[in-house]
């Protein structure tokens, strides 16, 4: 069985990890980095770029470069958070036929799970390149405060990417797994995971206990805000720059899509620099132009200014911490460790606020970018049966219930209930002779159903005519380990029942997902073709260059007919390379043709080289001979005549 990989599908960056024995390996992508920007660019020639290559070209292609799409996943177009993003994003956010928020690139409508699938596919390929074998199964993380629709949409993204999602796991829980299994501290510990990522914020209170040699991770409570993260911090800087530039130059940059993309890049860079410096300079020449000529942007921002700009955003993270502590039934002083997850927690102001609330310094020995992917990989190892010493008890983040008489939200499963769980309750009809009931399923904490998120609805029909209050309809809520809800309703008198897996009254249908899988496979085949074509073009370019060089040096050694043939084949290949519509077969044929006719040129080159080598060897031999002769002469010259006298014998 292949390995189950762990993927942290982030708003800003994504990361993939695997377990090798009991050692974790965070895998570098093809660019050599351990995290990949969650950015997808759709190019004019249908090529799809993912990660750093997409980020690099974003300034010149802002309308077709999609980022922070996770903020839209599983959301309705009408939601106020989506409406807020419409005014901020350089790409188009549109309303799909089913009322969901989708995006648009090159005039094509794309569902957020379809876009996120491109990032997941890159993570899958990264793992496959490292392992040298196909990968088909994954554990994917989501913010703990994601609702049912968002979890389902994330699972859909995995399917589109060609992955069987074995488990959806909450990001803070994954980080706790990574922390708990890496540390030597023994005994029961209560930890708080403060997870402020690119687009979402979560806080979870988790108890780590040693139960008969098995490490048990029990989530006591979770809370958060799925529309608060580093992207919002960046936006505050962008708004500030726009305001200052307008004051100085009288030009409003907020209407200039190209300028906005450059501002986004500069804001992110400035924010990162201000985590380690007290001041940074934003310098963007030629940011725009008007009748008086080009305009340049030059602005200094101090850490104090940034902290003032985002103070309320940092403050917004504290209330969920208070609620989580209260829901867990613990006191702040009971928390043994505070773990920071997500790149935005590197900001000193955030760390200061966390310390102020929890009364202790957060741990610094957890990598905020990689901990979540590591935890997902550990959970993958548990699910594959290779690890038996870990038990994970997660919770549902929001209450679930149905709408009853008067529009009231009747809770079936309360928030922070350990999952998987099942709950059944009997309801009845509101009118005499009512033959059908509509079950409307909601998620949220408001007393009235209308104030909560409608997850889905279905009918139970064929109820025998009876006075109101007589029929007994049993409604069952069943949450699986992924936090995804299955609902059933059964008429106890007739035994008739109806069941649904909540996919929201929006979401993608199975047919749409299957089509997206086919499109993705077709794209993969198309990408392979484009890669092969690029390889052929590169080979052609190299041959043109080497042939021209050889002709310059050895062309005069060829007879006129041979030279003409080579020049004709050379021109034919050059023309094919200039023709953007030329396919691989055409270029390969021209390369082959030039290769054939250039053989004579090659022979001349080798003959010339051999002659040169032979000449060099001969010259070297002659020189050596001369050296020997000279040496002998020198030796003779150096002989000293001895004096001797003849001795005569008697």
From Swiss-Prot:
Annotated Low complexity bias: 611-636
Phosphothreonine modification, residue list: 200
UniProt keyword annotations, A-Z: ATP-binding, Chaperone, Nucleotide-binding, Phosphoprotein, Stress response
Region of interest (Disordered), ranges: 611-637
InterPro entries documented for this protein: ATPase_NBD (IPR043129), Chaperone_DnaK (IPR012725), Heat_shock_70_CS (IPR018181), HSP70_C_sf (IPR029048), HSP70_peptide-bd_sf (IPR029047), Hsp_70_fam (IPR013126)
Keyword tRNA processing: no
Induction: By stress conditions e.g. heat shock.
A Gene Ontology molecular function term of the record: ATP binding
Keyword hit for Chaperone: yes
Similarity comment: Belongs to the heat shock protein 70 family.
PANTHER family reported for this sequence: HEAT SHOCK PROTEIN 70KDA
Biological function: Acts as a chaperone.
HAMAP family noted in UniProt: DnaK (MF_00332)
Name this polypeptide is given: Chaperone protein DnaK
Originating organism: Burkholderia ambifaria (strain MC40-6)
Organism lineage: Bacteria, Pseudomonadati, Pseudomonadota, Betaproteobacteria, Burkholderiales
